[in-house]
Amino acid sequence: MAGPGAAFRRLGALSGAGALGLASYGAHGAQFPDAYGKELFDKTNKHHFLHSLALLAVPLCRKPLWAGLLLASGTTLFCTTFYYQALSGDPSFQNLAPVGGSLLLLGWLALAL
């Protein structure tokens, strides 16, 4: 499957591999500051997996560049913000998460076009 969406398919596969690696780290190696950090990490990891799968569908939509850019940037911004908070206990970047979440929402809508 070539074309503008093929890169996002590969990015989705790499993102999924990264999500799996982070899930393993969270389950076996991470030191969380508190129970909330572990819960936040696990929820973030589920979102990471879900949106990695969405990236795999990007080549199938009519606007792959828009959908792919929105989903990739939204996943990065949303998940990185919460992974950081979960591992450090520092919530100073959490105000970026709604921006990432909004980009994810727009990415899902772009898949529907």
From Swiss-Prot:
Pfam families in the record: DUF423
Lineage top rank: taxon: Eukaryota
UniProt topology in membrane: Multi-pass membrane protein
Record's keyword terms, sorted: Acetylation, Membrane, Signal, Transmembrane, Transmembrane helix
Cleavable signal peptide: 1-29
Family, similarity comment: Belongs to the TMEM256 family.
Name this protein carries in UniProt: Transmembrane protein 256
